[in-house]
Regions:
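Membrane-interface helix-loop junctions in multi-pass transport and translocation proteins
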Residues: 33, 39, 157, 190-191, ...
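Alpha-helical transmembrane segments of multi-pass membrane proteins
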Residues: 89, 137-138, 153-179, 194-195, ...
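Interfacial segments at transmembrane-helix termini and the short loops linking adjacent helices
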Residues: 37, 146-166, 283-294, 356-382, ...
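Transmembrane helical elements of multi-pass membrane transporters/channels
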Residues: 45-64, 225-232, 236, 240, ...
C-alpha cells in the first residue's frame, strides 16, 4: 500500500507542472482577449464617430447626385464628373494634407502637450487655405479641361458651370478637415458626428426645397452642398472657440505663423499619399460604358470607402497616441486590431454589393441601360471594396508614425509603374475597356502597394519609432515652451 501511495503521489506531482502550464495558458488567453477588447474600445471611440461623420459628409454629395439624376441624364453626368473628378481630386489632396495633424496632434496629445493641438490646427488652416487658392484654376477652367480629356461638349459646358458654384465648398474643406482632426486627436468624436448629422439633415431638406420647390435645377443642388458644408464648419468652429476645449484651444496664437514650411512639407506628403490612394479606386471612363454607370459605381465605392478612411484616421490617431506616449508595442498592437476589423467589414460589404447588384443602380437613375451597366460592373466594384479595406489602414499607420513622404513614393511607384501599365494592357491590348483599366490599377497597383506596406510595418522597430515620436514632439513644441 505504501508503495502505491508513493507512486500516486509521484504521478500527482508530475501533473502539477502540466496543470500550471494550462492555468498560465488560460491566463494568457484571457489577458489577450482583454487587450483586444480594450484596444477595440479605444479604436472604435474614434472609428465609430469617424465612420458616421465621413458617411454623412460624403452622403451630401451622393444625395446631391441622386437628386440630379432624377432631373435628367445630362445633369447626372455633369454633377457626377464634378463630384468624382474636380471636387474628388481637390478633396483627396486637402483631406490628405489635413492628415498631417493626425501625426502631430496625435503624438502631442499622447505626450500631454495639449496646448499644441490648437497651434497645429491654426497652421493647418493657413497652409490648406493657401493651397486652396492655388487649386482654383481647376474650377475656373473645368470645361476646357474636360473637353481636352474627351468629354462631350454639352457635359463639359454644364460641368464647368457647376464647378464655379462648387468653389465655396472647396474653401470649406480647408477649415473642416483640420477642425475634424483637431477633435479626433483629443477623442471628442461625438462633436463631429453631431455636427455632420445636423448638416446632413439640413442638406436633405434644403436640396428638396431648391430642386422641387424653387425649381433651381442642378445649380440648386450644388448651392445646397455649399450651405451644408459651411454649416458644418460653423458648428465645429463655434464649439472649439467658445470654451469647450480649454486645454487644446487657448486662443489664436502667433505661433501658427511659424515653421509653416516644415508643416507644409509634411502636409503635402500626406496630401499626395491620400490623393493617389483615392485615385487608385478607379477614375477613368470608357466610351463603351455610360459615364453615368461608372459614376454610380464610384459613388457607391466612395461612400463605402469612408469606412476604411475612418479606420485610416482611427489608426493614425491610435498609433500616434501610443508612439507619443512611448509605447511602441501598443502602437503595433493597435495597427493589427485595426487592419483585421477593417478587413472583416470590407468582406461584408463586398458580399452585399454582389447580392444587391440588381437594385443599387435604381437609387441614382431610372434608365434601364444605365442600371444594366452598373450591374455589369458590380463584381469589379465588390473586389475594389475588398482590396481597399486594408491599404488605407496601413496608410493610417504611416500617418501615425510620420512616414508620409516614404509612403507617397510607394504609392507613386505602384500607381504609375505597375497599376497604370497593367490597366493599359488589360484595357486596350486585351480590349477589356474600362473594366480592364480599373482591374489593372486595383489588382496591380493596390495589391502590390498593400503587400509592400505589410512588409514594412511587420519589420518596423516600434520602440525606435516611439523614440522618434518623442523627439518630434519636443522639436515642434519647443517654440511654444520658450514662449
Amino acid at each position: 500500500m505504501g508503495e502505491r501511495e508513493e507512486e500516486a503521489e509521484g504521478v500527482d506531482k508530475a501533473r502539477i507542472p502540466l496543470l500550471r502550464d494550462e492555468d498560465e495558458a488560460k491566463e494568457e488567453d484571457g489577458e489577450t482577449k482583454r487587450e483586444i477588447w480594450m484596444e477595440t474600445k479605444k479604436l472604435w471611440r474614434i472609428v465609430g464617430p469617424a465612420i458616421f461623420t465621413r458617411v454623412s459628409t460624403y452622403s451630401i454629395f451622393v444625395i446631391t447626385q441622386a437628386f440630379a439624376g432624377h432631373l435628367g441624364e445630362l445633369e447626372l453626368a455633369a454633377i457626377s464628373i464634378i463630384n468624382n473628378v474636380i471636387i474628388g481630386f481637390n478633396l483627396g489632396l486637402l483631406l490628405g494634407m489635413a492628415s498631417a495633424l493626425e501625426t502631430l496632434c496625435g503624438q502631442a496629445f499622447g505626450a500631454k502637450k495639449y496646448e499644441m493641438l490648437g497651434v497645429y490646427m491654426q497652421r493647418s488652416w493657413i497652409v490648406l487655405f493657401l493651397f486652396s487658392i492655388l487649386l482654383l484654376p481647376m474650377y475656373f477652367f473645368a470645361s476646357p479641361i474636360l473637353k481636352f480629356f474627351g468629354q462631350p461638349d454639352d457635359i463639359a459646358e454644364l460641368s464647368g458651370t457647376i464647378a464655379v458654384w462648387a468653389i465655396p465648398t472647396h474653401f470649406a474643406f480647408a477649415f473642416f478637415f483640420p477642425l475634424s482632426r483637431f477633435y479626433q486627436c483629443q477623442l471628442k468624436n461625438k462633436v463631429i458626428a453631431i455636427s455632420s448629422a445636423v448638416a446632413l439633415v439640413a442638406h436633405i431638406f434644403v436640396c428638396w426645397l431648391f430642386v422641387y420647390g424653387l425649381k433651381l435645377g442642378v445649380i440648386g443642388t450644388m448651392a445646397t452642398v455649399n450651405l451644408s458644408w459651411w454649416l458644418n464648419v460653423f458648428i465645429l468652429f463655434t464649439y472649439a472657440t467658445c470654451g469647450n476645449c480649454p486645454l487644446t484651444w487657448t486662443g489664436y496664437s502667433i505661433e501658427a505663423f511659424t515653421e509653416l514650411w516644415e508643416f507644409a512639407k509634411l502636409s503635402a506628403s500626406s496630401g499626395l499619399m491620400l490623393w493617389i490612394l483615392i485615385v487608385m479606386t478607379g477614375n477613368l471612363e470608357d466610351t463603351k460604358i455610360a459615364v453615368d454607370a461608372l459614376s454610380i459605381c464610384m459613388s457607391i465605392n466612395g461612400l463605402e470607402m469612408m469606412i476604411p478612411l475612418a479606420f485610416f484616421a482611427g489608426t493614425g490617431v491610435r498609433v500616434a497616441n501610443e508612439l507619443g506616449a512611448g509605447n511602441g508595442k501598443k502602437a503595433r498592437f493597435a495597427m493589427i486590431i485595426s487592419v483585421m476589423q477593417s478587413l472583416i467589414i470590407g468582406i461584408i460589404f463586398s458580399v452585399l454589393v454582389v447580392y444587391l447588384r440588381d437594385q443599387i443602380g435604381w437609387i441614382f437613375s431610372s434608365s434601364e441601360i444605365v442600371i444594366n451597366a452598373v450591374n455589369n460592373l458590380s463584381i469589379l466594384l465588390a473586389f475594389t471594396i475588398l482590396l481597399n479595406s486594408v491599404q488605407p489602414v496601413l496608410s493610417g499607420v504611416a500617418v501615425g508614425s510620420g512616414w508620409q513622404s516614404f509612403v507617397a513614393y510607394i504609392n507613386l511607384g505602384c500607381y504609375y509603374f505597375i497599376g497604370l501599365p497593367l490597366g493599359f494592357v488589360m484595357g486596350w491590348i486585351f480590349k477589356s475597356g474600362v473594366r480592364g483599366i480599373w482591374a489593372g490599377m486595383i489588382f496591380g497597383g493596390t495589391t502590390i502597394q498593400t503587400l509592400i506596406l505589410i512588409f514594412i510595418v511587420m519589420r518596423c522597430d516600434w520602440e525606435k519609432e516611439a523614440h522618434k515620436a518623442s523627439v518630434r514632439v519636443e522639436k515642434w513644441s519647443n517654440s511654444e515652451a520658450r514662449k
